[in-house]
């Protein structure tokens, strides 16, 4: 079976570890004062949208996102010069990253940080926090002294907020399926007309692809899958329409395995991209989805726990109001006092009667001592029984109230190890474009492009529908980000 996804080789990522060298250089001036270093603000200018973020916030983002923010691995100013010594007054300039995508990232990570610190998981368990959840520092829990060597990696997915980072980089190439004729013999003008036509086609194709927001729709467009399906049709011969439909929706084993892993971790087959943007002036579409792993740190799990706890308390409240008070112990004590008094009186009488029957007196004395011991045992058992009946029932353990989340352990393969999967696909579509010309012979797919002659060129634009074949290359990057663990 094919690999699910190909791990990114460190040799192919020139700036992995991103910003590490620059961080080490600047760390020297903050020695002895780590909190000032981590809390120092960084001014980001993303397409003239200004954001202020702490160093810990920035460095807690996963590597796949840092590479998108800083492709060269360094901070750049407005002029494109490297900022070697970053200060509070410096402005880090980011050109090719959409501001709404950055806001989407910060929204998800801020919520995860809030759950980590304001709703600690250890309060659900009978374990001390020091042994259950390691202490973390900073906005996203970045701490140089933090270590997970003592924690089981499986438990990390239950103890810490985790985010599945899925990114798609899509490149598309447009191939018109028609021929062109020109009314002018000037080759330079004809090239301008053709360039304008292709620009309109690329813009329309970009809008079409951007509107396709379904995440898993791209998996079905692989050329390899289409070739396998065509081969199956040839081998089976003529198929019914129902068989054709079921075959067209079948994924390969690698794609199906990847889809099942994501769907078992919070995604659904209908999940859409959280952010999908086309780069200005390029046939490139970047998509991002941040899926919070459905573990014990989520708000949904807390709601289930609180509902189950309230239901359990409501069911056991009547029995708590009818607990038996320890009356039997008082009765036993009174019986014990009476027994002691009677034994004292009997002993005095026997002493006055003399020693006429010493054997009989000893037997009676043993009998009285046996009764006294029985009374003591009865008193002890009665008190224990009363205390047992008066003790309220204890709240069940966490997983007795709420089922333990079923988390796919294979996600740990992508923790701190971003992985990629690349495939090609093609699609034949029809696009509506505005061009300087019209169909000369639509049956033969011939378009005539005409050079505009009016003062207002836009008046000579005509809307036509043209067939286009799209060649699409998709690159998926998958990474697991765990909040609060360095």
From Swiss-Prot:
Residues 1-12, 347-358 have a biased composition (Polar residues). Disruption phenotype: Negative mutants fail to enter the G0 phase under conditions of carbon limitation. One of its GO terms (cellular component) is cell periphery. Residues 20-31, 227-250 have a biased composition (Low complexity). GO terms for biological process: actin filament organization; cellular hyperosmotic response; cellular response to amino acid starvation; cellular response to heat; cellular response to oxidative stress; endocytosis; mitophagy; negative regulation of TORC1 signaling. It comes from the Eukaryota. Keywords: Cell cycle. Residues 1-34, 227-253, 345-397 are annotated as: Disordered. One of its GO terms (molecular function) is RNA binding. The keyword Phosphoprotein does not apply. Belongs to the WHI2 family. Interacts with MSN2 and PSR1. Present with 1800 molecules/cell in log phase SD medium. Plays a role in the coordination of growth and proliferation. Required for entry into G0 phase under conditions of carbon limitation. Involved in the general stress response; acts together with PSR1 to activate stress response element (STRE)-mediated gene expression, possibly through dephosphorylation of MSN2. This is Growth regulation protein.
């Amino acid at each position: 079976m094919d690999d699910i996804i190909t791990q990114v080789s460190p040799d192919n990522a020139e700036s992995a570890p991103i910003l590490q060298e620059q961080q080490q250089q600047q760390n020297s001036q903050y020695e002895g004062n780590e909190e000032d270093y981590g809390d120092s603000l960084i001014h980001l200018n993303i397409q003239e949208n200004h954001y202020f973020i702490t160093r810990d916030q920035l460095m807690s983002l996963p590597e796949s996102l840092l590479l998108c923010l800083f492709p060269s691995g360094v901070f750049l100013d407005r002029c494109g010069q490297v900022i070697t010594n970053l200060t509070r007054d410096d402005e880090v300039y980011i050109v090719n990253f959409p501001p709404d995508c950055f806001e989407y990232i910060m929204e998800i990570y801020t919520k995860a940080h809030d759950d980590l610190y304001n709703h600690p998981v250890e309060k659900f368990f009978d374990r001390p926090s020091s042994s259950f959840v390691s202490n973390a520092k900073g906005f996203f829990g970045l701490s140089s002294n933090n270590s997970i060597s003592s924690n089981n990696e499986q438990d990390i997915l239950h103890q810490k907020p985790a985010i599945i980072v899925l990114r798609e980089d899509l490149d598309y190439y447009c191939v018109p399926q028609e021929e062109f004729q020109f009314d002018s013999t000037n080759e330079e003008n004809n090239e301008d007309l053709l360039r304008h036509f292709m620009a309109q086609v690329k813009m329309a194709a970009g809008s079409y692809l951007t509107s396709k927001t379904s995440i898993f729709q791209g998996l079905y467009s692989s050329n390899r899958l289409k070739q396998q399906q065509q081969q199956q049709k040839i081998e089976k011969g003529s198929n019914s329409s129902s068989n054709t439909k079921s075959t067209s929706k079948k994924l390969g084993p690698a794609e199906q395995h990847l889809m099942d892993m994501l769907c078992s971790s919070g995604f659904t087959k209908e999940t859409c991209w959280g952010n999908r943007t086309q780069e200005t002036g390029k046939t490139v579409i970047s998509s991002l989805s941040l899926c919070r792993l459905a573990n014990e740190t989520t708000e949904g799990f807390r709601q289930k726990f609180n509902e189950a706890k309230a239901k359990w308390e409501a069911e056991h409240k009547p029995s708590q109001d009818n607990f038996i008070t320890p009356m039997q112990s008082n009765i036993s004590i009174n019986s014990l006092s009476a027994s002691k008094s009677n034994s004292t009186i009997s002993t005095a009488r026997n002493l006055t009667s003399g020693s006429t029957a010493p054997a009989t007196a000893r037997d009676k004395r043993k009998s009285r001592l046996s009764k006294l011991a029985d009374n003591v045992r009865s008193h002890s058992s009665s008190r224990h029984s009363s205390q047992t009946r008066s003790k309220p029932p204890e709240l069940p353990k966490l997983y007795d109230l709420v089922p333990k989340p079923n988390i796919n352990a294979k996600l740990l393969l992508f923790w701190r190890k971003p992985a990629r999967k690349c495939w090609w696909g093609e699609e034949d579509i029809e696009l509506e474009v505005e061009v300087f010309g019209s169909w000369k012979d639509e049956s033969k797919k011939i378009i005539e492009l005409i050079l505009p002659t009016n003062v207002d060129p836009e008046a000579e634009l005509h809307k036509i529908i043209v067939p286009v074949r799209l060649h699409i290359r998709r690159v998926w990057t998958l990474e697991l980000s765990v909040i609060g663990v360095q």
